[in-house]
Each structure stands twice: as structure tokens, then as C-alpha cells.
Amino acid sequence: MRSIRSFANDDRHVMVKHSTIYPSPEELEAVQNMVSTVECALKHVSDWLDETSKGTKAEGETEVKKEEAVDTYSKDQGGRTLCGVMRIGLVAKGLLIKDDMDLELVLMCKDKPTETLLNTVKDNLPIQIQKLTEEKYQVEQCVDEASIIIRNTKEPTLTLKVILTSPLIRDELEKKDGEKVAMKDPPDLLDRQKCLNALASLRHAKWFQARANGLKSCVIVLRILRDLCNRVPTWAPLKGWPLELICEKSIGTCNRPLGAGEALRRVMECLASGILLPGGPGLHDPCERDPTDALSYMTIQQKEDITHSAQHALRLSAFGQIYKVLEMDPLPSSKPFQKYSWSVTDKEGAGSSALKRPFEDGLGDDKDPNKKMKRNLRKILDSKAIDLMNALMRLNQIRPGLQYKLLSQSGPVHAPVFTMSVDVDGTTYEASGPSKKTAKLHVAVKVLQAMGYPTGFDADIECMSSDEKSDNEGKNETVSSNSSNNTGNSTTETSSTLEVRTQGPILTASGKNPVMELNEKRRGLKYELISETGGSHDKRFVMEVEVDGQKFRGAGPNKKVAKASAALAALEKLFSGPNAANNKKKKIIPQAKGVVNTAVSAAVQAVRGRGRGTLTRGAFVGATAAPGYIAPGYGTPYGYSTAAPAYGLPKRMVLLPVMKFPTYPVPHYSFF
């Protein structure tokens, strides 16, 4: 299975190729203007036809009987001559690409379209277009195609085809009550197959908008494959409706959204598997009532050629050469790799069959992991690449509650541009970015610059509290002094509240987490939430903990900070200064009577630790510690002892004589 990085590389190539074949904004605007103008002009033509038919009917009513006139009037009121105009093809599906911009509309008629109606619409359409716009259009009729061809006279050159059709053409052969409906066709009826194809294109457009438009990367992959069909003659027979069905089935059957590169690979896998070949599953047309194969018009040779080409394209993609499939130059790697300098003798030497890293690169301090880790840490600290608080956080601290608004979103799908704004003291600041988060950050930088605050890493903000500055500079002593002052102020009750607003962690004077250090001294403490105030942008939590009958409180922007503040207050009150010696718990080991009991108790203490102790196999027990002294390490509870010194055993230690005991067989199993 390929790695995610290779798919990301395919995504980059596909999106760059897509940007080259996607129409320019000027071309899209010209398409929109032309289609909208013709749609509005056809609406005016429909109104003109209705007015003309009403006038003709009014003149004929004087020569007919009353009953016949009423019957004719009620029959004519069934609907308009031109029912409506709909977009089909590339315009409706959004699949336009450069040098392939076929624009199509369907003009739905009440009755079966005839040549007479086609000529009438063609003659009146230029008049209605002139009323709407000053641009010049050439209008021609094409009886063989049952359509009207409209061309513009300026760049970019566009061609719009308006096809006449009617639902009666498809419904006339359907059975009603077991009998065929016999209808008399006019003598100048337009080509029936062209009208049926127009109705099918209308169904295809509705199906595509409902099923394929919502799939991620489906439209992008279709544009890429349409360009492939234009470039490679082998793929030309697949262009159109079958290609859209294959892409929808390939991408829509995945259980997760796919990127552009992975979606294109999935379509190629589907074609390379042989679904087009004889004996395969075929391609069902979902827009037909009867079971229909959408690939029935293709020959066996064409299907085999497309399958062979898809397999070759899939192999190129698997070896990271998708740029050959797209016919583009390879893009440089987004992550530069380390290059080694090779000598001429290494390249041209007969014995150097495989290139290797120079031996000198492996020497030095790189083999020492500790030195390498220290050097990397020094680089990170010296580069100052980590900012504890960016411009947006600083602005929210200075002016909490600011409302950021999205003004606009522009640009193509693969490279959007967001514009955000914020109102500060009646002044509106705007900035753009590739994402909403980046745009908000740019707006915050503008506001801070306008207010006179520096935005660099080294700059100090005057509105920051002393706690924030001390945390950013690594001075934990200031935090301790502030917490002790807050503790001393609350003498009216047995509780103490500590207010700490900081971006960094709260630590004790020894550099430990206050909650962890307090838990080492007093286990089983319970922290309770006292209050929660403030809005969503500036919440304040107050936590309380009870230690030795005294209650201590701490506040912070979240529960974790408030809990640490309460623990720090308890440590400062109970375990600092003169109170530290009185509150420390000493581990007392009872003195055993006699030399033997003393040795046994020392041996038990030596083997007791994390988990269950194991007996030694020797017949002698050596005394490694005296009563009251426990060596630090795994032989003590929790691995460390509060009564033992920091390193090793004390210099003055009572030495016990080695006692010899009778040995008993020790079983290799235990039920305890």
C-alpha cells in the first residue's frame, strides 16, 4: 500500500494540471453572460408567441360557433407554446475546460417541435437579443440537428446550441391501459432521435447534479480525464456520459472523502480491472427505464485499448511518475533532502556499483545520542521558532470578545482566498489569507501594529501581567512569590485563592508540577469545582482542595490551571518555610528484638518493592541497610524513600553480622 506522502505528491501534480486546464475568469464571465442573455431572450420569444397565438385565436372566434369557440379556447389554455429552457451538458455539470467549451440549452416545447416552429424562434430570437444587450450574436438554424446555433463575435469565441424537444416524443410509444397511443405527427416534424437525445441529456444533467456534484474531487477528476480524452485518441470514445458514470461509481463507493490524486488513481484502477472488456459487468445507465448498457456503442477493440492504457497509467502512478500521465513537467519535492558531495573517482570507479554515504559523515558527535539531542535542543532554543503566544492570542488578551467576520471567499477550489475583518474602537481592519485561521491571524497583526504593540517574538507586551512575563522568561520564583502573596491575603477563611493567568505551565520552585508534588506528600486528595464564570472567550474556573483540614482555592482559564494553582497554594502554605519540617511524613521502621529478628526485618525490607518480592537462591542473607535507613531504588516503596539521602547509603550506618539460616526448598510457583 502506498504511503500518504506519495498521494500528497499526486495531489500536487493533479491540482497544478487542473489549474492549467481550468477556464480563466474572463472566459467564465463570457460564458455566463452569453447563456443568461440567450435564456432571457428565449423567455421573451415565448411571450411573443403566446401573444401572437391569442391574437389569431380572437380573430377566428367571430367565424365559429359559440360551442366550438369555447372548446378551442379551453384546449389552448393548457400551456404555453414554449414551456421552458434548461441547461444541459458541460454548462449544467460545471465541466468546462479550456479549448472544450460546448454550451448547450434545451428548449422544451408543448407540442412536438417542427421546422415551422424552429424558423419562427430563429427569426425572432435576434430581435429579442438586441433588446437585452449591445453585443452582436450570429443566429443560425440547423434542421438536421433540431437546433439553433448562436455564436458571439468577440473573443473568446463561444458557440451555444439550443435544441428543441418535447416530452410527447418519448411518451407517444408508451402503453396506456394496454394499448398504444396513436398520435398524428405533423409533416415537418424535426428529427425524432435528436429530440430523444436532448431529453436524455436533460436527465443526465439532473442525475449528475444530484449524485456527482457532492462528491469530493469528482468534478476535478472529470476535468482531468476530459483533457486526457482530448489529448489521447485512445480515450476519445469514453468521453461524455460513460466517463461521468465511471467516475461517480469509482469515487462514490469509497467510504471516505478522497483527494484529487487518490481519486484519479481509483478511477484508473477501476478501468484497469477490465470492467469494459467483454464478459465484464458493463456500465448500467441509471437514467433509462429499461436495462441499458452505456458502453454499447463502443467496439471491443476500443474497450481493450482503453483498458491497456489505464493499466499503463496505473503503473506510472505507482512508481511516482504521474506527471507522465498528465503530460506535464515533474514538480520539485516539497521536502528537500540532504545531498552528499560525491567525488569523481566514486562515480566513475569500477568497484563502486552502489552509491553509499561517505564514511566521514558517520563520524564525530552524531553517534552520541545525548550530544545530538542537546545540540538539536540548543538549535531550537536559539532559533526562537516557537512563540508561546501569537498575535491573535495577544489581541484576544488585550481586547477580549472581538468578533471576526468573513467578508468574502474568492479564488479557485484548490487555492481559496478568505478575507476576514474585525471592528476595534469603530475602526474596521481587513486581511486575507489561504484559510480563515490565517486571515484572522493577519487581521490581529494589523490591529496590534495599529495600536502600537510589537508583534515579534522578542517584543514584550505592556498589558501582560507579571505572571505571564515570568513564565515566558522561565522565572518560576516570581510565580511562587505571587502565589504566596495571594495565599496570605485570604486570612478571613481557612481557604486560600491563587489567581494565575499564564500561557506556560505552572511549576513549583523545584520545577515540578504542583499537583504531582502535592500528591507525593498527601495522597488521595480530591479537587472540586467551586465556580465557573465568564463567556466562551474568557472563562474563569475556581478549584478547591482540602489538605490537613485546610481548604485552598486556585483560579485559572481552565480546570487544569485552576487545579495547579490550588495545589501550588497548598504547597506554599503547608510545605514551605517553618511548616515544611512539621508536615513531612517520616517512614518509621519498627525495631525488632534480637539480632536474628533485626536481620530478618532488614532482609524483608531489602526484597520488598514494586510488585511481589522474590527470594534469593543462596543460603545467606546479607544485611544491606540498617534499621531506619532504606537505600533508594526499587527496594523501597514507590522506588524512592523520603527518609533516605539523595545518593547511596549514609556514611554512618549500623552494620549487622551475617547470620546463617537453614535452607529450605523454594517452589517455582506462588499462589499469592
Swiss-Prot record:
One of its GO terms (biological process) is cell differentiation. Residues 349-371, 465-498 are annotated as: Disordered. It is found in: Cytoplasm. Residues 477-497 have a biased composition (Low complexity). Its main location: cytoplasm. Keywords: Cytoplasm, Developmental protein, Differentiation, DNA-binding, Methylation, Repeat, RNA-binding, Spermatogenesis. GO terms for molecular function: DNA binding; double-stranded RNA binding; single-stranded RNA binding. Residues 5-363 form the DZF domain. SUPFAM superfamilies: dsRNA-binding domain-like. It holds the Pfam family DZF_N. InterPro entries: dsRBD_dom, DZF_dom, DZF_dom_C, DZF_dom_N, NT_sf, STRBP_DSRM_1. Residues 387-453, 510-576 form the DRBM domain. GO terms for cellular component: cytoplasm. Residues 357-371, 466-476 have a biased composition (Basic and acidic residues). The modification Asymmetric dimethylarginine is found at R612, R617. The keyword Signal does not apply. Interacts with EIF2AK2. Associates with microtubules; it is unsure whether such interaction is direct or indirect. PANTHER family: SPERMATID PERINUCLEAR RNA-BINDING PROTEIN, ZINC FINGER RNA-BINDING PROTEIN. Involved in spermatogenesis and sperm function. Plays a role in regulation of cell growth. Binds to double-stranded DNA and RNA. Binds most efficiently to poly(I:C) RNA than to poly(dI:dC) DNA. Binds also to single-stranded poly(G) RNA. Binds non-specifically to the mRNA PRM1 3'-UTR and adenovirus VA RNA. This is Spermatid perinuclear RNA-binding protein.
